[in-house]
Amino acid sequence: MTTRPPITLSIAGTDPSGGAGIHADLKTFTARKTMGTTVITALVAQNTHGVSRVYPIDVDFVADQFESVLGDLPVDATKSGMLGSRDLVELVVDRAAEGRLGFYTVDPVMIATSGHRLLETDAVDAVRTHLLPVADLITPNLPEAALLISDDEPEAQTTEAMRDQARRLLERGPGAVLLKGGHGSDDEVIDILATADGQVREFTHPRVTTMNTHGTGCTLSAAITAEVAVLGHEHTEIGSDILGEAVGNALDYLARALTSAADWQLSLNPEGAHGPVDHQVDIVSGRPA
């Protein structure tokens, strides 16, 4: 009898400081008990103070990476983060359309917290019209959700506005939308999960007061991807209830990771630094609660 772990794939850029991108995704995949694989789209010079330079990877080489992974390993679930260009968006769309990515989560990374643009302007329309329809789940934050709807859409300011935007994003074709409320200012963070079958549910967590929020979006989408891969080994289909369970588990993990790292001071220049979350909170003993 042969066995294997759930296999997950991250399509994203690098982060040499280890807090976001491919590096955060691999840590999260391991923490959530899957075997992580990668397709790297860009080499990014960044740290806890922001992005300083992006070096895009040639599209042909990205395609070669895809073939190296997908031609050899049965991927159960995939997430994409930084894609960068229209050509890369279209390449990922092609791979998703081939049915080789498993359950596919799109984290629509567009602009870094530091303000550095991570998606070319002409690629935004390709994300809206081509990438979203092949996604099983998209995980935009409030600014990203507004931009995915239209160039002049305002950010949602209320829970009801979030629900409305999540429903409107569903009209662009993804199987589900997780609209993240972390960019709000309330004491509680509310995230909205809307699925194509008409279900809408809220997830609520106390806001963790910390500067160490670097890579939270990457970590959450990777955790959801891993949870779906694990649950997919137990269920024949990822319906709304199973997806809701995966999202809930991932949000709980992120809350623990944020809380554990809330008081970390990693940077040699701490003023204005945004450190990472504690990806290993569940697997390394001795972490402060």
Regions of interest found by a model, annotated:
Residues P16-G19, R207-I224:
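Short glycine/threonine-rich catalytic loop with a Thr-x-Gly-x-Asp
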Residues P5, R53, H235-I238, G244-A289:
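Charged C-terminal helix
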Residues T14, S80-G81, H116, K180, ...:
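Glycine- and other small-residue-rich loops at beta-strand/loop junctions that grip anionic moieties
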